[in-house]
Amino acid sequence: MSARTKEKTKDKTKNDEQTVSTEASAADRNDREKSSSSEPEDNAKETLTKKDSSSKKSVDVLAAMIEQKVQMSGSAGLGEFFGRMRPEITDAFFAALEREADVSKVVPSSLSKLDDGQVVDLLSVGEERTLSQSLFQLEVVTSIPHFYQLTAKQIGALGAQGGYLKAYHGEQVYPFIDPVANQFGRGFDLAYVRINTSGQGVELFIDPFDFDKVSCKVGGESLTGIGLSNAVGVDEITYDDVKTPEQMMEFVVLLIAGAAKMGRFCSSGVDARRRRKLFKTWVRRPVSDNFRHVQGWLLEDDYENYPHVPEALTVFSEYQWFAREVADNMTDNGLGTSVQMEDGPNIESFFNRKYREAAICNLDFITAEAHANVMEELQNEKMNVSAYVDLLQSCQMGIFDIEGDTDTIKLKVYMREVEDYEAELTRMMLFPGDQLYVDCLRTAALVSPNIRQFILSVLIQQATSRVGLIELLPVAEMTASLTSRDNISVSHNMALTLAIGEWKELLRLTNPQQICQKIVCDIMAPFVDGLRMEDSLGVPTPSKLVFSLLGAKVALILTPNLYDYNLHLKAHLVTMILSCFFPDQYGALIASRGYGHDVTGNRIDSIRDGERTKKNCRFATYTVLDPIPNGPPDRTRRKWLLMKRVQEWLLRNDLVRRREIRDIIYRPYANVLRLPGQTYLPRRQAAGAPLPCEVLLNDAIAILEEYRTVFHHPNDRNQGPQDRHALTTLSNLLRWYTRGFAEWFHWVYRPLYLQIALHPIIFWSHRLGQGVWRQFPAVREDRERRFDNHLEGVPFDSPVIAAFEPDVALNPFTLRQGADLLGRVHAQGSTFRGGAYDSASVILLSEYEALYRMTDSEGMVDEYIKTLMASRQLLEGLRLVAELSTGELLRDTPILDYIRTAFCEGRFPSHIFFKILNLFGVKINHGVLAQVGERSIEHRLRGDYRVYYPRPGFLDPALEFIPDRIVVVDPVRPSVRRNVKLIMDAVFDPEFGMIKMRKGVTFSLRPTNDLTFSSFHEIPPIQVEMTGNVNYVYDSETARTRAEYDVQVRWEAPGRIITMNLLVTSSYEILSSMEDILGREVRAFSFVVQDVSKFSGIYYDFMLSAVRKEHAIVWFPNLRGILHHHAISIEKVETCFKAAELAQFSSFLSLRPTALIKLNVVQTTNIRGGILPPSVSKPILPCEGVHPSFIFALMSMWRRIGFAGLPSR
């Protein structure tokens, strides 16, 4: 998405070269805008799996730049390993970056640990299957979407007889005549509608006459049937013998996911010449005068599969481009206002095509309502163009970010240019500008490791795209200036040669990719848990001291945030220097104060091997990072004070600057980032005005002089003339290295760092303070909701730290890497090159101006939008699962009672929980998030796996969870909630739903002479319940043992209900006893089975005997079933159902209370022809029946369900 913005610059000088550069930049941006706009003719699915061409171009450029660097440098690589980057690694790296930039790859979280030396996880990217279409994406449809499908059944002997509707001329003019005639032109027994979606984002098929073919598919997940057969070894899923509710739950989950995608379509697009059109594909049959009024404005429809007669009306158009389009293309065809009456109809009296547009109305009411819900929601997300321009500008460096004569340069400035079509299309441009999106990003980055991984990869891509601006010299060129002075070789000095060898031995070669990587890691320092690596500096010498100090200081300067958020690494760095060069003094310091203190203030006198990360570290403070006292007043005091000076110098960093990104509409939270230093406009530094970084580094040379004096007296026989000469040479020449590094740092590194730090995807701030480094970002479940629902084992029950897995690649620069960068970095126009004065160097301000202007604001904002939408989609999925697991989501829906009874009141099945989360793009497992991995097997088996929407916050040094003040209460889009209710009603509504659930089942063999879908067995008023007591009595007359059943009989009397217990052996005794009590004839009674799980075999034979004698019916008031409709002839009722339902009655013995059974209901009045029997018996029927609204006696009745609904309210 891009606004109509025009890039303008402030002309500070009349530099032709800069003007040309500006024009080229503008041309590039125009090309990018053209390439980023997708053609409407492109396949919608292709746009989901491919990046836009601008991002593809940037990845290609990135690939070319890195490949060039690999060829030029033998040490190029990614991460902390040496050697040339292998082709398979580079291919995977670029492919990973390209895939990670797609929002569909953001949602499934990746919990795998990164391999050593990697920042982008090359192994897990792209492995997880995700939704092929984002739940937030609008699809441009090529045909009118449908939810319902009108069809007919020809069943009886006379069902296919009748005249054929033939409309000769009409079938050639109207595209809908033939399909309607073919479907309904001959005789048919009944017409009905079924759910068979198209263009909805969900493939749902529900035929109330054939439930075995029920299917639902959303993205990569699909389900056939709504029940799972219990037969062992049966592979196919059938509707019969439904005894477990899990698959129904999965079906409901798929419906909810489908509701999140329903209605997200639009029918406007552009043609090949980039002219805006109302629809992509038009119907063109200009034959009939009546149809000519709407020809060209009805979208193509699938009349073959969805036979219907379309309707259309006109509404006023709000767009000027529409009026111009009509004026250009419709004036000469008889529909323009400028034509005469004899050339065509009077448009002024009919409808004015220049001011109105046709609106399709042949959407069924479900599709229309779902579409209206989405469109109404999107109306609230119209782009604020001015705010969008401000967002673009916030990604750019400002004049105040640069120190120097900034009048000689010009920076990139975005300004809004209002044009005619922009003013009109502003209503159509959407932007996730609601503050809720930003809140979702802040929360999702803590909940999902993959969101953090995506942010890391985005910033890595931005940083690595600038890798060509970083120049590193070969090691040989770096040390060449030390072996000669004023073109005179000094290599005969063995002490100097040894010093140079010490420097080379200290080095760990670094490449430009690692520098870009460390910039990103330093920005993301709050989420990095550094991994401490053991190292030793070896034998202490004065020359090694200065190289170590400079290397350590360079590392601390370049990555200040990583060290400040990982004090265990900073303490290790300082310890490594102090213990090597001041062993006695360091030992005395540790002996007197210990290594540090924990959070309770207890002294720590030992370091454990396992304390390599701050997560596993006991320390709250370190002795080597605290102020060191002045030391004992003895002969070693000077050494102690020198150690104190070294420690203070290492910990002092006056270069760090705070940069506040101000609060604007589309970046609603101001954040403050700590930057390594200040950007200086390149210029020749006067003798008395060195750069701040140079001043700071030169203190190490002064320390070297003092160290020689304190530890190696000039008259010390261990230090000969060559040693003193070598150190003097180093002291002089190292100033050239520090100046060259300082120029690179202030001219190149700092602006590169700032450009990455200005990315809008960065939502956090860098904080400092006592104990901040031990404040871990974390998430935790809502304890109150968990306790209210009496749950154990829920995910995030204990606080889960939101940080990257410890990895060397995420660590800050080390001392050895700093020693390498000190001598090898080089900036364009720098005074010194590898410690040698470069008299031919010339500063080209145009190159640095290009550096300041190279930020692609549109690309950064595009990545920001993807992350915002992916974050909300993630939290929306979590919230929907949370509300589904407690039943809140299905409140006021027909399915609520069943879902609450089957799932919410008992243990939530873990495999259903994982399937739900995976469907919504959330991949977790109980070992990582449920915090039950180390608990007992019994606890894991009893664990109730459901999500209650974790809250963001952080763990303080005492590991207490502190909730964040910003809480995303409800990330679910209103349209999703409305469409969930809509689709649940369409599927499960007792009146017009396709799947009608009924509570209450009756079993009877009483005959009837006709059956309809609303037929039911009448329940006699006398109710009999089995108490469970059975006595077996021996009958001496018959020499047999008979069973006596204790039954409780209940009937109504005026004003009261009478209950009586009887001891009977047969149904005759019940009837006779009740006749004696009531004083009247009693023909039948009803057995009542309240709990189907207590329906035992002892009662089965007794009840079945009474039913066969037509003395009783069996009533299961709490048993649930689904109505399965059959339209058959009455002569086939007993053949099809009697024996099967007698067997089904016996299967009730093994049902659970949450079971769903198949309730076959029959319609015999529609079928014509055949032999009519006098009566039939249909054993199992629901307690109450409702005539289904999806069946119509006449063709015109299809309009009852709203097929003429509007696409918007």
Swiss-Prot record:
Entry's Gene Ontology molecular function annotations: transferase activity
Cellular localisation: Virion
Spans annotated as Disordered: 1-53
UniProt entry tagged with the keyword Coiled coil: yes
Keywords tagged on the record: Capsid protein, Coiled coil, Inner capsid protein, T=2 icosahedral capsid protein, Virion
Compositional bias (Basic and acidic residues): 1-17, 26-53
Family indicated by similarity: Belongs to the turreted BTV-fold inner capsid family.
Function per UniProt: Inner capsid protein that self-assembles to form an icosahedral capsid with a T=2 symmetry, which consists of 120 copies of VP2, with channels at each of its five-fold vertices. This capsid constitutes the innermost concentric layer of the viral mature particle.
Note: Function inferred by structural homology with BTV-fold inner capsid family.
Complex formation: Homodecamer; each decamer is made up of two conformers of VP2, called VP2A and VP2B. 12 homodecamers assemble to form an icosahedral capsid.
Record protein name field: Inner capsid protein VP2
Organism: Colorado tick fever virus (strain USA/Florio N-7180)
